[in-house]
Amino acid sequence: MATRQSKTAKRNKTQNQKRNVESEVFTDSAARNLLENQPKLTPKSKVKKPSKLAVKKQQAKVRLYGAKNGREYKESELQIPVLNKAVVPGVKAKKGKKGKVFVDDNDNLTMERLVKSINDKYDKVNESKLEKSRRLEEIREVKRREMEKKEEQKKNKLDDKKKELKNKASVARANRRKNAKEAAKEAESDEPRKKKVSFA
């Protein structure tokens, strides 16, 4: 059985209503006409909002299988504006792909190593342990020869530089000696010569 309300409660219920603020667009016809003529300032979103059912399905999948990791973007893709850097005068930064090493055409060792290592990665061959160890040994041998070749090249380069420096030093020494001789000759020529008399 419902409880009876007092008269004051009934009065309060009817009197204390919320004020409704109506926009003049609905009451004033002129304002409504002005609003109709306004261009649509905000363009419609091209992305369609998923329905409630689709959202529920997606959430159920997330609960079952876990959320997919979103794609990670690189800094270059995000188009972040580059802050002002200190520019070193006279130094030009290299452009182009970094870490790109070109192999010489006549560098057979590097080519051989690359071919063998690529085959090692991508050839799914059922081979015995002996064959596999032999193949790995070949790759190691090629790498070792390549390292030896690089060391030899370094040594040759260093020797060439030493020779060049020695040659420069010897040329400079020869020039200094030549200049000293010329200076001595000039000094002798500047002094007054004494007359010499020879008796027969």
Curated annotation (Swiss-Prot):
UniProt keyword list: Coiled coil, mRNA transport, Nucleus, Ribosome biogenesis, Transport
Any one GO BP annotation for this protein: ribosomal large subunit biogenesis
Function according to Swiss-Prot or TrEMBL: Required for efficient assembly and nuclear export of the 60S ribosomal subunit.
Family classification: Belongs to the LOC1 family.
Coiled-coil stretches: 121-191
Compositional bias per record (Basic residues), positions renumbered to this chain: 43-58
Annotated localization: Nucleus, Nucleolus
Taxonomic superkingdom: Eukaryota
Assembly mode: Component of the 66S pre-ribosomal particle.
Principal subcellular localisation of the protein: nucleus
Region ranges (Disordered): 1-58, 143-200
GO molecular function: mRNA binding
Cellular component, GO, one term: preribosome, large subunit precursor
Listed Basic and acidic residues bias regions: 143-167, 180-193
Name recorded for this polypeptide: 60S ribosomal subunit assembly/export protein LOC1
